[in-house]
């Protein structure tokens, strides 16, 4: 269970870092917004799922 928690936490940190860089770039360029809209929404959903998963796994690890 600890390994799964660590992998989920690493994925959350990596996705957070990518979204901190990618979302402002997508919002700043008007031509990229139409192309990046679905990717931003999927990333947001994945981030939310990872936050919940890390919280649940934290309950089982500690």
From Swiss-Prot:
Residues spanning the membrane: 8-28, 41-61
A single BP term in Gene Ontology: photosynthesis
This protein's GO CC annotations: photosystem II reaction center; plasma membrane-derived thylakoid membrane
Swiss-Prot/TrEMBL keywords: Membrane, Photosynthesis, Photosystem II, Reaction center, Thylakoid, Transmembrane, Transmembrane helix
Cell compartments where the protein resides: Cellular thylakoid membrane
Pfam families cross-referenced by the UniProt entry: Ycf9 (PF01737)
Coiled-coil region: none
InterPro entries in UniProt: PSII_PsbZ, PSII_PsbZ_sf
Entry annotated with the keyword GTP-binding: no
Bilayer topology: Multi-pass membrane protein
The UniProt record lists the keyword Transferase: no
Entries under PANTHER family matching the protein: PHOTOSYSTEM II REACTION CENTER PROTEIN Z
Subunit structure: PSII is composed of 1 copy each of membrane proteins PsbA, PsbB, PsbC, PsbD, PsbE, PsbF, PsbH, PsbI, PsbJ, PsbK, PsbL, PsbM, PsbT, PsbX, PsbY, PsbZ, Psb30/Ycf12, peripheral proteins PsbO, CyanoQ (PsbQ), PsbU, PsbV and a large number of cofactors. It forms dimeric complexes.
Task performed by this protein: May control the interaction of photosystem II (PSII) cores with the light-harvesting antenna, regulates electron flow through the 2 photosystem reaction centers. PSII is a light-driven water plastoquinone oxidoreductase, using light energy to abstract electrons from H(2)O, generating a proton gradient subsequently used for ATP formation.
Family (UniProt): Belongs to the PsbZ family.
Protein name: Photosystem II reaction center protein Z
